[in-house]
Amino acid sequence: MALEDLRQSPTMARLLDALDRGEDIGHRGRFTFASVAARFLPKEEVVAWLEKGSGGGEHEAKALVQQVTERGYNPPSRQRLLDYNKEQAFQICPTPDDPDTCNLYRELTMPEEVIEDIEEYREQQFEAEEQGEAAPAR
């Protein structure tokens, strides 16, 4: 998936536009951008986009992309984006009252490995609940 395809997501387009203007999209915005973009773009391109915004340089951008890819973080859910809005000045989701917005899983066609990872996590969560254990850590 190319950059143009990422722009089909209004949420990702908002982040891309803000980065292009050199804005600070906040730590959660950078994490959201990296966790999505790293699934669709070469790592070097994700780093270059993160460097455009204020709030971090090349070292921080490379470290974030490495962390996201090595740990296999999945893109955040809509609810998580709404939680992120409360934690920082830059609003990742500018329309929190509209339930049809800011859902990355509806806005983009996620790679199969993302869907498989989520399904595996939910199975582990169900099994843990069945056995009366705590849910697996993410």
Where are the regions a protein language model picked out?
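Basic, alpha-helical nucleic-acid-binding regions used in initiation and control of genome expression
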Residues: 1-138
